[in-house]
Amino acid sequence: MHGGVGHTDEGKLWGARFAGGPSPELAALSASTHFDWALAAYDLAGSRAHAAALAACGYLTDDELAGMLAALDRLDEDVASGAFAAAETDEDVHGALERGLIERAGADLGGKLRAGRSRNDQIATLVRLYLRDHAGVIAERLIALVDAIAAQAEAHPTTILPGRTHLQHAQPVLLAHHLLAHCWPLVRDLERLADWDKRANVSPYGGGALAGSTLGLDPLLVARELGFAASSENSIDGTAARDVVAEFVFIAAQIGVDLSRFAEEIILWNTREFGFVTLDDSYSTGSSIMPQKKNPDIAELARGKSGRLIGNLTGLLTTLKGLPLAYNRDLQEDKEPVFDSVQTLEVVLPAFAGMVATLRFHTDRMAELAPQGFSLATDVAEWLVKRHVPFRVAHELTGSLVRFAEENGLELHEVSDGQFAAISPLLTPDVRTVLTVEGSVASRAGAGGTAPERVAEQLAALTGRVRSLAARREL
């Protein structure tokens, strides 16, 4: 017993079974305090709940529980202030904090806290606590970004730009419609976080190393103390599963992809060739050698960091794919991808929101390009269909019109009445009624379309959905 305490003083939770300490090489490989210290506050919260569970089973007296909690509170304050930190000899956050507890409560009382729990159920629980907290932060920052995009959409209710497929001019659309198309994936990301929390809201505490405990501890008591709705149904699954972690990292990667797609457009729109936007000075950078440069660094970094987020997911899944039940030390490698994904999003999202909120759109340039590239060709084909021309024929006639215009350096509205008639008698002068981008946009008034009234309804629906999701998080 005393030998075990001696090893605990060194920041390790094992040792008596071994004749000597680990080699320096093993200690260096095994150490994790340089990254798992991020879980210190959650470890202390778990220790308080575990102490209460031990007291409920009679393993701590009321006085011992009070002394234990007081020591944990002092340790918590010292961790927060920086007065206590992990030492080089500490293997991980758990060992470091047990050392800190024993320094404050004494070896006899401090050494009792480990009864009935293992690092296996402990770490599985702490990661969920960490992720649930940070999921809330990420959700708030996602909402702020959606609000910034929606505000730009609301500020530009009539601006038209060329909609694109394959990066080619396709059909004119409202800028607001295009911007809102970037909001909905982010709303689904919010919904994914909310749905993920149903599975994360389960505590693995009480599973011990893998088989549970003989001490009669109540896992549900600890779960509720820590804010979980339930405890694990299976102690092996609780300690060994990391699908909840992988799911979170997937959501983070998906958010990164959604940001990256918008970032790519902002980068293009900011070029002189497009000329659709100007970045605010406070959200762009210059060049160390070219005085004229104004670079879209936030968009580029968001695009780059999406690859990092995808890499975190790929690395984590690769680590998990070959592990037999139950716990394996490989699972130590789940922390850094998780922490990195969280930290990346928590930095990228507010920067991206600020960039979007301060974008200045060049609506005249968008209006200039909107009818170009024969973007009204589909309107011509559908105008013919409304006159009972089979769509196959209408498609071919419109294709002939486009070829003629292209060969003669004309846009569709520049083709003369005589030239229309020469292409086909079906192309009467009335075809000009559909050769305006305003008319094209207004005519697409079906549900989900780009007509102004539909976009206004869409904006209201988006706002309601986001406010509902925000309210659910506050419950």
From Swiss-Prot:
Catalytic reaction(s) noted: 2-(N(omega)-L-arginino)succinate = fumarate + L-arginine
CC per GO annotation: cytosol
Pfam families tied to this protein: ASL_C2, Lyase_1
SUPFAM superfamilies attached to this UniProt entry: L-aspartase-like (SSF48557)
Principal subcellular localization: cytoplasm
Keywords in alphabetical order: Amino-acid biosynthesis, Arginine biosynthesis, Cytoplasm, Lyase
Pathway: Amino-acid biosynthesis; L-arginine biosynthesis; L-arginine from L-ornithine and carbamoyl phosphate: step 3/3
MF-aspect GO terms: argininosuccinate lyase activity
InterPro entries per UniProt: Arg_succ_lyase_C, Argininosuccinate_lyase, Fumarase/histidase_N, Fumarate_lyase_CS, Fumarate_lyase_fam, Fumarate_lyase_N, L-Aspartase-like
Keyword ATP-binding: no
Superkingdom field: Bacteria
Subcellular location: Cytoplasm
GO-annotated biological processes: arginine biosynthetic process via ornithine; L-arginine biosynthetic process
Top EC class, one word: lyase
EC number: 4.3.2.1
Protein name: Argininosuccinate lyase
